[in-house]
């Protein structure tokens, strides 16, 4: 029923092309298109604007950053039930780091929708990832947390984010460090800096 309503809304909208492009990325038609347009506006556009005309994606970027961390934490918590906090935190940091978000923005085609005065904004080290965060913030305002989770689960995990590969890289870090140190003839010392004791 929701899909039918969204499609009818799409048919009678004045910006079908933009909605269609967003649907290819999101997997659903957006409702509040204006918030997605704002998510794709880089602050460089404000150079020639004044007063209330100034608008950019930085507030949505702030919101999206928090939502992404929550969604990824949620997904990892359920995907790896036997893993400790340190492992989950390490894997999450790799997924949400700037280089990963830049890659997601490029692979999903989001970079083609970004509005910026920078000619080569696709190569800027911040713009694509920031826009991706803002996009997730827009999804949250438009549809809520569940749809942000769905976006990651159905559109990103597996296709653009290989959880098993990221987890394996984390599991193998210690062994790779030892292997590298032996090759370079360095001595690596592992020292216990803390221990959690649970009372029974």
Placement of each model-derived feature along the sequence:
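Double-stranded RNA-binding/processing signature
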Residues: 1-200
């Amino acid at each position: 029923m929701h899909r039918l309503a969204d499609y009818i809304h799409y048919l009678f909208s004045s910006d079908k092309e933009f909605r269609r492009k967003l649907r290819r990325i999101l997997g659903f038609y957006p409702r509040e298109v204006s918030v997605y347009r704002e998510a794709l506006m880089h602050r460089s556009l404000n150079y020639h604007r004044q007063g209330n005309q100034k608008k950019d994606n930085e507030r949505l970027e702030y919101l999206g950053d928090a939502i992404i961390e929550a969604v990824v934490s949620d997904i990892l918590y359920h995907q790896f039930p036997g893993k400790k906090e340190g492992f989950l935190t390490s894997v999450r940091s790799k997924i949400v780091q700037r280089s990963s978000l830049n890659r997601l923005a490029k692979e999903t085609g989001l970079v083609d929708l970004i509005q910026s005065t920078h000619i080569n904004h696709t190569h800027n080290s911040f713009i694509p990832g920031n826009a991706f965060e803002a996009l997730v913030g827009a999804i949250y305002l438009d549809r809520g947390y569940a749809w942000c989770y769905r976006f990651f689960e159905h559109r990103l995990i597996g296709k653009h984010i290989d959880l098993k590969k990221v987890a394996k890289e984390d599991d193998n870090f210690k062994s790779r460090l030892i292997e590298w140190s032996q090759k370079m003839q360095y001595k690596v010392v592992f020292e216990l800096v803390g221990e959690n004791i649970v009372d029974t």
